[in-house]
Every structure is written in structure tokens, then in C-alpha cells.
């Protein structure tokens, strides 16, 4: 990089500690999506809430309305941004595509392709704002492991609407028939009964 090709003009994003949160380092990424510009960063929100130690960071997104010539100074917020549109469940989604999770890890399937993997029984993933439209009673899930994955709506402690039974060391495509049609917009939880259950992909049909 030619040192004469640029000029330092100061910072544009405050440390989380300057925004009333715990202090932490940061790794940021700037992105433009549908005409709006954002900053992806991390905070210690989860560590604060769980009262733990060790730098337990979580990914966050905030608005950063920069232009080609100006970067206004902005800060991290606890609320973040609103969801830009509902998720379409009738398209296939990676198990790693989520809003948040607990007790989960990842297993690489191939270059750029990941599955989520439970670290313990009771692990879960949370997909926010899923629009089932006029409704479905069927899912197609690709998963492996020994145990079950439960589908729950709107509350991770809700009664399961569907149960995916697993007994395989390899990924299987499993059709799931639900006892009740799902309609409209819901938050979706996948709850894992035991360790080492992998969810690669899911889709409503």
C-alpha cells in the first residue's frame, strides 16, 4: 500500500465500552444490503447476561450510514437493526443459518458448507421471523446423529410441533409430517436431545 495514497481521518465506530457496555476488542465488517449500509461487529452481550468470564463474544449488526466520502461516528446498540424481511421456509436453508443458538458447534461438510452440531442435550438454534404463508404440514430435513430434533414455534420451551428421529452416522434426508399446519410468521426453534446431532439443511414443502 502506497503510504501517500491515503490519509488517516479518525475513527468511525466507538468501542462497546463507549456505548455503555463491557469493553472488548472488535473485528468489524462493512456491508451494503438493499441500499442500506451496516456494520457487523461483536459485543459481550451474552457474557453480560450470563454473568460469565472469558471474552464470550456475540455477533451484532448496526446501521452505519457512510458515504463514499464521509464516515459518521456511530456506536454499538443493544437493540441492533430490525429484520429486513421474513425468511422464506420454502427455500432450502442451512442449519447454520440462524438468529442465535446455545450449546452449538459446527461441522464442515465441504468447502464453504457447514452443518450445526450440538455440544450437549438441550442445545438449540433459533430462526427469527419465518413466514409460512398459507401453511404447510411438511418439512424435509437433512441431519445425522443419535437422538431427536424437536421443532418448536415462538418459544424454545414450547411443546414440540414436530419430532425428527435420528439413528444414523451419515446424513439422511428425512421427511417430516406435522400434526398441525403451520401458517403465518413464526420464530422457529430446533431443539436437540443429545450431543453430536448435526443439522445440515431444512425446508418446508
PLM feature spans:
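Carbohydrate-active catalytic/glycan-binding domains of CAZyme proteins
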Residues: 1-205
